[in-house]
């Protein structure tokens, strides 16, 4: 008898071989080792239509919102990393049901993580040899590690997900301004809060909202473009209810958004991204000032803490040209951050933040400050409109229907939910799988299972200064005294604070890492001195991805090898029409036998993926871009594909940003404004046990105002 973890009616979603999509109601059953679905609620030993064995290699991919036959559904795709072609795609008409299934399946996957036993023989890194293909030929890094269960609580909350893909990341032009808001809400650190106060000032309080204005001056925007402004308010409703209203452009929007005239869907890019046309109703001397309209890309995501982020930015589209009688405004960035708060008196509460940075264009926008101010406040007042709409609306107990952009569905398929029961089955998993393959031909001919295609922390405890100094002393080691003058890269080294198109070594104390007592009190300390010295940085470009850059003749790693030094080379690969690679060369005299870093260097890929961590910072640049990058530590091997090449005197880590749509989207928007940014990155090996603590940085780098044109094409001939 198999124990049923979860079951119920869900939507089977897919596309037939002739290209037409379909949705059907199917009964899904989740067991501890199996996910299956049936045409009807199963009886006795009834064979399922299709099954999938659930183990630690399975993933739940969030495909976002899709419209089919007048219904908007929230799509999930479950697959095994070892057999990506074999997957089950399911959907729900309401967000809560889809998220419940997602949570249940992920819990089952987590229970199987312990079955993935690390084996140095199973995943063996190789040493590169001349003549081998320059492509991705090193050992596989597509395997998870059981050590990931020991990640920071605050890290796992906002990480690029190790197990779940949240769909395509923000499009290249979209700026995610919400990361700092996440830090504020989580009270991640006092420095983050001070950083936020430094860049915002409270402008006024209006209609129960706090209106803030950004203090940061930017020189790359026209005079007519306003500073970013945000409205912050509390709405007594769930995040899902508010998200439904924010995403809709039907008649309901007139009841809470006083700046909305009308809108339509221009193009559905994927489940998380759409191009919209939006006419504004600004009502400011309409006889003199022409009305404004917008064509923008909208991207949304749901975070692990239950919050929703909706981002906007203007975009040109061939099917949405300028309209007669309207001035096309330019939305530099904007959107909503919808985050849950603790309930009060049994009622749900949500903090809604609405940010807008817009250039209204036209003759008056640059010379009539009152016009700009009036329009911005009118648009920001939509937060108070949301609050009042929910306070005056009854009968909100029914499940939230996901809004349809065009031709909102007035009727829906009945979502029958069977009562809880334990499905009896005497068949083994292998027998069930084999039988279900045969049953598909005779029982699911109208429901083709071919894969459909779509375009591609917690608060930290207070620490005393004395404790921090004590931990820092324990991690300090004598300087390596390496002569850096013999190393060079094509990106210039410059320690001047205002230098451009260059790099310098970051102060380790800018980053916080796990202290000696982290397992007991979750305390983090300034990182202090690096384990290795950063000696050179290369900035490359090519028409294809650049793998194994250490083979380039005369590179810093080869120079280090000639001097008897060991190198760790991090090759950050940025995909695109032109591929870029930023290569960091870290050097040390020797590996300490038995140390965590030595185990990382000589371990297998599974162990490396479970431990390699990145801490990003963006100290200078557009405030909105800073939020899209954030400052939360990320286990790189869980977020993107990392290819490890172990040589006699080096370890090269090729970090393929293009392997993650989330990371690719974030990095894509950074590339667009890279010349205005100063970015800091720290690399380290995560410590999980008291014996491994405290953590030490491998190294850290600060890259300032990099010019894309300064990248060179490397000569990577193997000989």
From Swiss-Prot:
Keyword Transmembrane helix (UniProt): yes
Regions of compositional bias (Polar residues) in chain numbering: 426-439
Ranges annotated as biased composition (Acidic residues): 442-461
Domain START: 180-392
Free-text note on domains in this protein's UniProt record: The pleckstrin homology domain (3-110) binds to phosphatidylinositol-4-phosphate (PtdIns(4)P).
PANTHER family per UniProt: ENHANCED DISEASE RESISTANCE-RELATED (PTHR12136), PROTEIN ENHANCED DISEASE RESISTANCE 2-LIKE (PTHR12136:SF100)
GO molecular function per UniProt: lipid binding
Coiled-coil annotated residue ranges, if any: none
Record keywords, A-Z: Cell membrane, Endoplasmic reticulum, Endosome, Membrane, Plant defense, Transmembrane, Transmembrane helix
GO cellular component, one term: endosome membrane
Species the sequence originates in: Arabidopsis thaliana
Subcellular location(s) of the protein: Endoplasmic reticulum membrane; Cell membrane; Endosome membrane
GO BP: any one term: defense response
Region (Disordered): 134-173, 414-478
Bias (Basic and acidic residues) ranges: 462-477
Role, per record: Binds to phosphatidylinositol-4-phosphate (PtdIns(4)P). May regulate the salicylic acid- (SA-) mediated resistance to pathogens.
Transmembrane segments: 665-685
SUPFAM superfamilies for the chain: Bet v1-like, PH domain-like
InterPro entries given in the database record: EDR2-like, EDR2_C, PH-like_dom_sf, PH_domain, START-like_dom_sf, START_lipid-bd_dom
Residue intervals of the PH domain: 3-110
Membrane topology (UniProt): Single-pass membrane protein
Protein name: Protein ENHANCED DISEASE RESISTANCE 2-like
């Amino acid at each position: 008898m198999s124990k049923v973890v979860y079951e119920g009616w869900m939507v089977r979603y897919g596309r037939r071989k002739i290209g037409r999509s379909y949705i059907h109601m199917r009964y899904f059953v989740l067991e501890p080792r199996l996910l299956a679905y049936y045409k009807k609620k199963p009886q006795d030993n009834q064979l399922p239509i299709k099954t999938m064995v659930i183990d630690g290699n399975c993933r739940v991919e969030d495909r976002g919102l899709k419209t089919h036959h007048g219904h908007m559904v929230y799509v999930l795709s479950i697959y095994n990393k070892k057999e990506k072609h074999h997957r089950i795609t399911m959907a729900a008409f309401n967000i809560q049901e889809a998220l419940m299934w997602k949570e249940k399946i992920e819990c089952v996957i987590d229970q199987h993580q312990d079955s993935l036993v690390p084996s140095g023989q199973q995943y063996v890194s190789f040493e590169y040899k001349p003549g081998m293909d320059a492509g991705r030929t090193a050992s596989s890094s597509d395997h998870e590690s059981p050590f990931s269960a020991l990640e920071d609580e605050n890290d796992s909350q906002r990480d690029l997900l190790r197990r779940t893909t949240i769909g395509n990341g923000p499009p290249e032009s979209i700026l995610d301004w919400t990361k700092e808001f996440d830090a504020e809400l989580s009270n991640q650190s006092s420095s983050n809060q001070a950083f936020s106060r430094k860049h915002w000032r409270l402008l006024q309080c209006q209609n129960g909202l706090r209106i803030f204005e950004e203090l940061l001056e930017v020189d790359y925007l026209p005079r007519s473009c306003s500073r970013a402004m945000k409205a912050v308010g509390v709405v007594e409703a769930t995040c899902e209810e508010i998200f439904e209203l924010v995403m809709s452009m039907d008649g309901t929007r007139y009841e809470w958004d006083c700046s909305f005239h009308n809108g339509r869907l221009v193009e559905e890019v994927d489940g998380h991204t759409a191009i919209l046309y939006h006419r504004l109703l600004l009502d400011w001397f309409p006889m003199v000032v022409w009305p404004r309209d917008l064509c923008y890309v909208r991207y949304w995501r749901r975070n692990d803490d239950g919050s929703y982020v909706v981002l906007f930015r203007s975009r040109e589209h061939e099917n949405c040209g300028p309209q007669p009688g309207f001035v096309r405004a330019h939305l530099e960035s904007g959107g909503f951050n919808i985050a849950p708060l603790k309930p009060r008196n049994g009622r749900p509460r949500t903090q809604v933040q609405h940010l807008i940075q817009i250039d209204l264009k036209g003759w008056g926008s640059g010379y009539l400050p009152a016009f700009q101010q009036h329009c911005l406040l009118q648009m920001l007042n939509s937060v108070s409109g949301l609050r009042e709409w929910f306070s005056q609306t009854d009968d909100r107990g029914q499940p939230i229907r996901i809004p349809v952009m065009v031709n909102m569905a007035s009727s829906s398929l009945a979502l029958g939910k069977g009562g809880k029961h334990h499905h009896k089955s005497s068949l083994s998993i292998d027998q069930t799988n084999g039988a279900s393959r045969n049953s598909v031909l005779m029982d699911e001919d109208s429901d083709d299972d071919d894969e459909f295609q779509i375009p591609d922390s917690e608060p930290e405890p207070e620490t005393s200064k004395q404790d921090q100094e004590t931990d820092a002393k324990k991690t300090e080691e004598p300087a390596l005294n390496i002569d850096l003058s013999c190393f060079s890269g094509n990106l210039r080294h410059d320690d001047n604070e205002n230098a451009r198109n260059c790099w310098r070594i970051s102060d380790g104390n800018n980053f916080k890492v796990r202290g000696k007592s982290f397992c007991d009190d979750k305390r983090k300390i300034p990182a202090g001195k690096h384990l290795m010295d950063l000696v050179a940085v290369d900035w490359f470009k090519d028409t294809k991805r650049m793998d194994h850059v250490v083979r380039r003749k005369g590179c810093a790693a080869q120079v280090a090898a000639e001097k008897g030094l060991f190198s760790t080379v991090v090759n950050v690969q940025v995909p695109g029409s032109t591929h870029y690679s930023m290569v960091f060369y870290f050097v040390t005299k020797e590996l300490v036998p038995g140390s965590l870093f030595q185990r990382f260097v000589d371990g297998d890929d599974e162990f490396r993926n479970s431990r390699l961590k990145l801490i990003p910072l963006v100290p200078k640049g557009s405030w909105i871009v800073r939020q899209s990058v954030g400052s939360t530590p990320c286990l790189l091997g869980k977020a993107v594909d990392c290819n490890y090449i172990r040589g006699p005197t080096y370890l090269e880590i090729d970090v393929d940003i293009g392997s993650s749509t989330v990371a690719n989207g974030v990095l894509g928007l950074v590339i667009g404004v890279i010349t205005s940014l100063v970015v800091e990155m720290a690399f380290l090996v995560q410590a999980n046990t008291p014996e491994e603590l405290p953590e030490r940085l491998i190294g850290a780098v600060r890259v300032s105002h990099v010019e894309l044109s300064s990248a060179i094409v490397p000569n990577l001939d193997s000989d």
